[in-house]
Amino acid sequence: HNIVFSNSNYEQMARCTFDLIYDYNPLFVINVGGCNPIADLCNNITTVCCMPCINKPALSTSSIYIRYFPYTEDDDRIYNDLLLNYQHVYDMPFVEELSGSNGCIQVKSDYGIDEDKFAIIIAGNRLDKEIRQRFIQLLNDISSPEDNVVFVFIGDCPLLKNTLKDCDFYNKCVFTGAVSNFKGAVSIGDLFLNPPRQGGSTGAYYAIECGIPVLTLPSCDVASVGNAFTCHTIDEMSDIIHRYMHDSEYMNQQIQNCRSSFKKICSCKDNLPSITSFISKLKEYMNNGGR
């Protein structure tokens, strides 16, 4: 089923969705993303597992959280500190799109970009809300001394596009809009630049798979690709990017870090055993009276 919600029919569709799940009487429900009142209502009829797409627990009344990304001991402690007493977290590493992505690799000329340009990828579905003035200033700082740079915005962002029209570097911007081959679009880049935000990890994983270094703050979800791709503050990013552009030895080292980081991430992504293990733990939890 693919149920389409809108502001005009939300209550009606919510009731239909709940009734549909009730009639199916499933063993459990997985809520991808979190912050879903319909999924929370389903806690009254079955076990609901919340799988956030960020590295922190999303707001949910579910008793089970599913975590699918790599984490450190400190990450685990912080994650569990944010849970309520009745909530538990189970790991289910599952990033099938990394190894099984069907998108073909693309080139810069597919988007009207000269192949000798240094393409900085900025990707996401919420760029209109995520790009703040400080990040725009960063783009200006990057572009001011560089004639050879181009910023490639992947995803619909009409408000951001309108805002950047008044910026001196607007002629160095390319807006792809929504793309059917996300990995292919990311693959044209020389660097994946992550604005301060939650989410964005899929694009970063695609980047390192393609040997494209990532630059992000350590507090962002994208930092899960590895410490080699983080910096402490946004003020450092401009100098680091200029180093990527002009220090080939540094760039080559970071490309090697992409390969080792991607190999490490994918080494634990054997999906079937991961899913089987999660189901076994969930059934044990439910057999012991949990919901």
Question: Where are the model-predicted features located?
Answer:
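Active-site and donor-binding regions of nucleotide-sugar-utilizing enzymes
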Residues: H1-L59
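Active-site-proximal region of nucleotide-activated glycan assembly enzymes
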Residues: I45-N102
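Catalytic binding pocket for nucleotide-activated donors in carbohydrate/polymer assembly enzymes
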Residues: I78, P195-K263
